[in-house]
């Protein structure tokens, strides 16, 4: 499961254009909120995305945060625990050029796994710090 299923160059070009257009007439926070909304919409267009017994089913924005909801597939044996899956997914996202661009623009990610087998919920937050990106 990877955000790179989206056409990255097209998305980056679009987002850079939007960033350029909005930077003159909107505050940084408003700009980041609009980018988060667009990023959530772009992810949503590719849903559901399945990987390792988990399915990304929802992406929505709240302010400058892109919230993503993943569920464990009912009746399917997962190959990783939810925590291990989140760690792996975080590593993939932090390496993705589109995600890196979003993080440098002030976008954060909140990833939640709802484990349908146990009823437990697992959450991970991604920002510049968790992905090791220093502010320029």
UniProtKB/Swiss-Prot annotation:
Disruption phenotype: Severely disrupts assembly and function of T2SS-beta, mislocalization of GspD-beta to the cell inner membrane. A lipid is attached at residue 25 (N-palmitoyl cysteine). A lipid is attached at residue 25 (S-diacylglycerol cysteine). Pfam families: T2SSS_2. PROSITE patterns: PROKAR_LIPOPROTEIN (PS51257). It is found in: Cell outer membrane. Disulfide bonds join 94-131. Residues 1-24 form the signal peptide. One of its GO terms (cellular component) is cell outer membrane. Changing residue 25 to A: Precursor protein is not processed. Cryo-electron microscopy shows that the complex forms a cylindrical channel with 15 GspD2 subunits, each of which interacts with its surrounding AspS2 (GspS-beta). Belongs to the GspS/AspS pilotin family. Part of a type II secretion system (T2SS, formerly general secretion pathway, GSP) for the export of folded proteins across the outer membrane. Required for correct assembly of the type II secretion system-beta (T2SS-beta), for localization of GspD-beta to the cell outer membrane and for export of a labile enterotoxin by T2SS-beta. Each AspS2 binds to 2 GspD2 subunits and may clamp the monomers together, stabilizing structure and accelerating its assembly. This is Pilotin AspS 2. It comes from Escherichia coli O78:H11 (strain H10407 / ETEC). The lineage of its organism: Bacteria, Pseudomonadati, Pseudomonadota, Gammaproteobacteria, Enterobacterales.
């Amino acid at each position: 499961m990877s955000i790179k299923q989206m056409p990255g160059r097209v998305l980056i070009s679009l987002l850079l254009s939007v960033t350029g257009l909005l930077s003159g007439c909107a505050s940084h926070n408003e700009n980041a909120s609009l980018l988060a909304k667009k990023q959530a919409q772009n992810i949503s267009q590719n849903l559901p995305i399945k990987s390792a017994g988990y399915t990304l089913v929802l992406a929505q924005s709240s302010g400058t945060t892109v919230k993503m909801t993943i569920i464990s597939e009912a009746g399917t044996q997962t190959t990783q625990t939810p925590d291990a899956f989140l760690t792996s997914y975080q590593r993939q996202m932090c390496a993705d050029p589109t995600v890196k661009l979003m993080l440098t623009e002030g976008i954060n990610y909140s990833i939640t796994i709802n484990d349908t087998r146990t009823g437990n919920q697992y959450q991970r937050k991604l920002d510049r710090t968790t992905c090791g990106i220093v502010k320029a």
